[in-house]
Amino acid sequence: MKYSVVTFGCRVNQADSLAIEAELRGRGADCAPPDEADVVIVNTCSVTASADQGARQAIRRIARDNPGARVIVTGCYATRRPQEVAALPHVVRVVPNDLKETLARELTTAERFGAGDGACGASIEPGVAGRTALTLRVQTGCEERCSYCIIPQTRGRGRSRPMPDVTADIRRAVRAGYKEIAITGVHLGSYGRDLRDGTTLETLVRMLAGWPDDVLFRISSLEPMDCSDAVVDLVAASRRLAPHFHLPLQHACDEMLAAMQRPYTAAFYQRLVERIRALMPHAAIGSDVIVGFPGEAPSHASALVSFLGRLPLTHLHVFPYSDRPGTPASAMREKVSGSDVRQRAADVRAAGRELTRRFHQSQVGTVRRALTVDDGSQVVTENYLKMPVGEGVARNEWVHVRIGGAPGALVGSFAS
């Protein structure tokens, strides 16, 4: 059997797809492009309406380009709207998230899907050719109730992988040659709460900080209230942990944060990122913001842009508000017009570009540890800057690079 996996969305979905691919390969299936595969698995996202649309377009394109293929759809869109997905061309099966990990076995043994409790999951088998970094999912599900978010309905309750399983996967990844591992989860900050053995996110990060092999761990997105002083201190002190944080802000006005049901204030967020910057002057600190949330007035939008300009952030992901039926925000009045949302998104993206420019400028002339990627002619630094280097070396090697060039066009050269 020839298979192809098409993935949309977050790092958790990417990790899920890698696990599916690894199990399919282990069961004798062969990877192929979507237009040549017997079976195409589409792993969908549903965080926004445009994510749903992108999945539908991809499925229709697969049906057009490979009319003989069987299309299996999984992920958050498939979980949220199974009948809608099942009606798309060539879709032979819709697999909800809590049965995703049985998919490879079903395909290769023709077993019927049984009931499942959606445990956090099967062990991965790392080793995808051409990759230097692995995304390792250690947690899934979310029990927060952000008023705009559909994900708790599609991913279910929070479930953590036990620490022995996580360490076993890391050992396998190191043996397979990976030198960077991104640790991810749907609500990573809740890691361990369901294990009932005292394990916490800090327990996990402390284990990573003391890992004996020369591997870099990159902690994926953390909610601000979960990024404790202890976690920040561990990252600052350990060579094993990348100086890289992603901390979703969502808005700068406490009134909007309360409407979004985000459990922190703008002042709390500012103190957090300023503490990180004080401890790690070269750290990458990314964030997410939502513009056009119901009830957002022009004054709120202006305050957001002003607040962002005062923060030591390095890059932004800007999300125009997307109405998700079934969420509290969907029932809110005072919706912002589409034209206003687009203008506000443009203003915030401009602020984000300025943050990135300032960060790039601060890094010119510095020497950073980096991993060679692609064919060895590119590097990714520990603080998440990707740039070409003047001469190629072997892929997947640790090097030191001196950063040159200009903001938006950084260039590295090997430092002695």
What are these regions (language model features)?
Residues 331-416:
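Terminal RNA-binding accessory module
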Residues 101, 144, 189, 254-255, ...:
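Glycine-centered loop/turn positions within well-structured domains
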Residues 1-191, 206, 230, 245, ...:
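Proteins enriched for Cys/Gly/acidic motifs involved in redox and nucleic-acid/cofactor modification
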Residues 46, 155-156, 194-198, 258-264, ...:
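Short glycine-enriched, charge-decorated loop/helix-capping segments at active-site entrances
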Residues 7, 185, 221, 249, ...:
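Active-site proximal loops enriched in glycine and acidic residues that flank catalytic Cys/His/Asp
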Residues 71-72, 80, 175-299:
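Conserved SAM/AdoMet-binding glycine-rich loop
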Residues 296, 312-313:
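Contiguous mid-protein beta-loop-alpha structural module that forms a pocket-lining wall or clamp
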Residues 41, 76, 103, 183, ...:
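Residue-level signal for inorganic ion chemistry
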